[in-house]
């Protein structure tokens, strides 16, 4: 197809290969090392929280962009980690032997990543020796636990912000264009990995030096054209290619619909407040973006699943397995299918309640997630006023931090209480629940007896959580436990947590049988089709996908090409819109055609491209390389028509949306004036 690399060029543990330049950025994104000094490219939205954390009204890097002219000006980001996979080992046989040795047979135990990491540490001790500083281990189940792979990784924790475009470039189109093609976003940010002077991973220190990587990507100044071969590497999060028909229905009618309905309420309230005040807009920018991203994904997945009739597609998959089961006398495979279908139906109401609590309270009402004092021992320690003061400063204010706004939370809470109560009534109508829930009863009784204004006033105006002196006084006083327990925020947060535990416990009754049935289902699929014909579902481990640059037909008589240009930015430009405004310098670059050597042969400036590669959440920031392994783009999204690919790959519709690296180079070169970075990059024509 156009690949000019050998297997060892792509993965060659210890020797330096393409895979060594691919990093897991934070907990849910990908990035790539692009220089001999540890420079990392990822998406603007992957670095958004870091950019936001360094922003203020006086120095608004979200709005204006950021560039560090020297190494000394690069900004540290506590809590941000970057990991590089150094070795991948098939650990299936080792795990089986280990489980037999310790007598562990419960899949709910041994399929957990935490348990598997303990097994990985034992493997490392036996095969590599003592665990070295900076080494991180992961072991993950594949094919629902029919295979296990172990990942030896190097983890770096001194990661500094180097450059970021203004949001009018990095987030152009914002939520309106999210999941959409054609697209015109310069969705990138630049960081650098630092190490101790000896090259080992280290916490932030002024003495640290830029990483000297085993391998880094050269950057193609030539770019790509329609039909060209491309390959992508990254850490995709979750896919569900082996859903049964009932699981498809559950995803659409329960999971997605509840997420869509409740996030819409939250987002509309947040947006109204964000548009009133620039400071609030900065505070809630990342929260809003995170919410809308999953919201639009749910809408797109449901649309695709219905349009492509995924339920029927999965029925065909199941029918093939049932026929195989009958032909080869393998009744366990038919039994597994029947168990899955039955359990999905039985757990429907509990599943709906879990999603309502998660989307409507836990993720939406910030006071519902407030830190609690949950033991007598902890309370006894906090009787000391000094300890209580320290707990308030570090824990309470650590949660209700600079990105929290009480008035925004007040308005969101009012909207969510109403929406959640209505939703619970709807999904439980005519049913006698096997569990008792505290929060809905308490909130309803509270609202009916006191009224909405007084209830919200009690939470946000009277709670000791928002008054340090009162909190310390209560905690350090005799009998303070009672006053603390009766505080409105304590009551809300405690009841929500207890209800979620109750629901989770009831749902967990299905977990073991469900996990075993899923494993048997996949065992049958592997036996029937062979491992080389089935890719395992994504699980945040390093994966490769290949394809070509290619447009698509989204509907009758409409064709979307594979490349967009700055012409499209100017067509969408609207300074009255917070999503499509442009800073004057961007307009000047376009009007003066100041594109340098990054323009297409026809003089137009490339911005985004699409490819047939198969991606999902976690692939944000993934490097797109040509057949020679040179960086040609950075993945940042998928198209609306292809979002359902998490359940069933759609080659005619599904496209990865990618930042053309030539637009990134233009922004660094012409907008940010990042001369030292341009010299640092290895740009090939």
Whereabouts are the PLM-identified features?
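Terminal presequence/propeptide segments associated with secretion/organelle targeting
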Residues: 1-685
């Amino acid at each position: 197809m156009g690949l000019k690399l050998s297997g060892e060029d792509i993965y060659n543990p210890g020797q330096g290969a393409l895979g060594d330049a691919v990093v897991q950025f934070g907990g849910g994104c990908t990035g790539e090392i692009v220089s001999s000094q540890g420079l990392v490219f990822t998406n603007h939205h992957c670095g958004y929280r870091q950019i936001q954390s360094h922003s203020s009204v006086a120095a608004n890097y979200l709005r204006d962009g950021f560039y560090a002219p020297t190494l000394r000006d690069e900004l540290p980001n506590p809590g941000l980690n970057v990991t590089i996979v150094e070795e991948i080992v098939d650990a299936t046989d080792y795990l089986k032997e280990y489980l037999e040795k310790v007598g562990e047979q419960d899949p709910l135990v041994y399929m957990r990543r935490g348990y598997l990491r303990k097994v990985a540490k034992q493997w490392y001790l036996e095969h590599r020796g003592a665990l070295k500083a900076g080494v991180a281990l992961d072991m993950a189940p594949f094919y629902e636990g029919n295979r296990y792979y172990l990942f030896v990784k190097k983890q770096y924790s001194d990661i500094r912000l180097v450059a970021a475009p203004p949001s009018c470039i990095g987030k152009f189109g914002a939520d309106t264009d999210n999941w959409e093609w054609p697209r015109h976003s310069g969705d990138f940010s630049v960081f650098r990995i630092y190490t101790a002077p000896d090259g080992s991973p280290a916490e932030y220190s002024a003495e640290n030096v830029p990483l000297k990587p085993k391998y880094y990507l050269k950057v193609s100044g030539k770019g790509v054209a329609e039909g060209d071969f491309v390959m992508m590497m990254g850490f995709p999060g979750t896919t569900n290619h082996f859903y049964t028909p009932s699981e498809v229905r559950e995803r659409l009618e329960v999971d997605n619909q509840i997420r869509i309905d409740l996030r819409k309420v939250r987002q509309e309230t947040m947006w109204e407040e964000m548009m009133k005040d620039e400071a609030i807009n900065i505070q809630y920018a990342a929260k809003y973006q995170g919410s809308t991203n999953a919201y639009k994904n749910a809408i797109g997945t449901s649309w695709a699943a219905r349009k492509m009739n995924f339920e029927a597609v999965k029925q065909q998959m199941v029918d093939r397995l049932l026929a195989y089961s009958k032909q080869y006398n393998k009744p366990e495979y038919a039994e597994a299918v029947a168990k899955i279908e039955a359990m999905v139906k039985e757990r429907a109401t509990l599943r709906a309640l879990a999603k309502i609590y998660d989307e409507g309270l836990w993720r939406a009402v910030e006071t519902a997630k407030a830190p609690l004092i949950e033991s007598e021992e902890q309370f006894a320690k906090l009787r000391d006023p000094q300890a209580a003061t320290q707990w308030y400063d570090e824990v309470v204010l650590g949660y209700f931090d600079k990105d929290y706004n009480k008035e925004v939370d007040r308005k969101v809470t009012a909207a969510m209480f109403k929406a959640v109560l209505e939703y619970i009534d709807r999904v439980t109508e005519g049913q006698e629940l096997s569990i008792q829930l505290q929060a809905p009863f308490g909130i309803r009784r509270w609202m009916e007896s006191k009224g909405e204004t007084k209830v919200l006033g009690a939470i946000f105006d009277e709670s000791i959580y928002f008054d340090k002196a009162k909190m310390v006084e209560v905690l350090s006083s005799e009998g303070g436990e009672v006053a603390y327990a009766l505080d409105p925020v304590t009551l809300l947060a405690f009841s929500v947590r207890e209800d979620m535990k109750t629901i989770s416990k009831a749902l967990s009754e299905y977990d073991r049988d469900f996990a075993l049935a899923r494993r048997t289902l996949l065992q049958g699929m592997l036996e029937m089709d062979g491992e080389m014909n089935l890719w395992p579902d994504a699980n945040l481990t390093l994966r490769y996908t290949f394809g070509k640059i290619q447009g698509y037909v989204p509907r009758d008589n409409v064709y979307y090409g594979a490349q967009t240009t700055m012409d499209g930015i100017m067509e969408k430009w609207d300074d009255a819109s917070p999503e499509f405004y442009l800073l004057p310098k961007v307009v000047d670059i376009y009007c003066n055609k100041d594109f340098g050597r990054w323009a297409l042969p026809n003089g137009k400036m490339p911005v985004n491209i699409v490819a047939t590669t198969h991606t999902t959440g976690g692939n944000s920031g993934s490097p797109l390389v040509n057949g020679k392994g040179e960086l040609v783009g950075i993945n940042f999204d998928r198209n609306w028509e292809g979002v359902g690919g998490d359940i069933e790959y759609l080659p005619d519709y599904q496209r990865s949306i990618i930042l053309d690296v030539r637009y990134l180079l233009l922004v660094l070169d012409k907008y940010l004036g990042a001369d030292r970075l341009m010299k640092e990059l290895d740009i090939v024509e």
